[in-house]
């Protein structure tokens, strides 16, 4: 067994990349491989865990989804109805013909509904903030 020097780390997930890094950190602790964390290593690590069926680690990555109901994909609508998702707001007055939702959930819920969407989020996570949404329409 290789001993890794202990450190104190406070992780915050203020964006998708931060959430994925948090999930990697939790997974690396589980597998006792903290010493392998490098910039960007979360992409390869999390995709490997998904391929092995260890998707519970994805619960450490919070996901915030917002948009009008009539513009959401069927996956997003199903995620909204998941028992693990939480509504923050349902603004009915923004557009009379469609509700605007803010949904808080985690990447495992997204994966369970659409593995392809979850993998795409992991692979595009090197972009920050609004760039992610601009790139995906």
What are these regions (language model features)?
Residues 1-137:
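Family-specific signature for flavin-dependent thymidylate synthase
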């Amino acid at each position: 067994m290789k001993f890794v020097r202990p450190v104190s780390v406070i992780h915050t997930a203020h964006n998708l990349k931060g959430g994925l890094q948090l999930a990697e950190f939790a997974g690396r602790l589980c597998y006792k491989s903290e010493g392998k964390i490098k910039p960007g290593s979360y992409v390869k690590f999390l995709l490997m865990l998904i391929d092995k069926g260890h998707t519970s680690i994805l619960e450490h990555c919070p996901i915030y989804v917002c948009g009008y109901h009539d513009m959401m994909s069927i996956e997003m609508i199903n995620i909204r109805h998941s028992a693990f998702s939480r509504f923050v707001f349902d603004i009915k007055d923004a557009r009379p013909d469609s509700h605007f939702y803010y949904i808080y959930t985690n990447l495992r819920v997204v994966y369970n509904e659409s593995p392809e969407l979850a993998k795409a989020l992991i692979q595009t996570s090197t972009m920050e903030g609004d760039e992610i949404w601009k790139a995906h329409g």
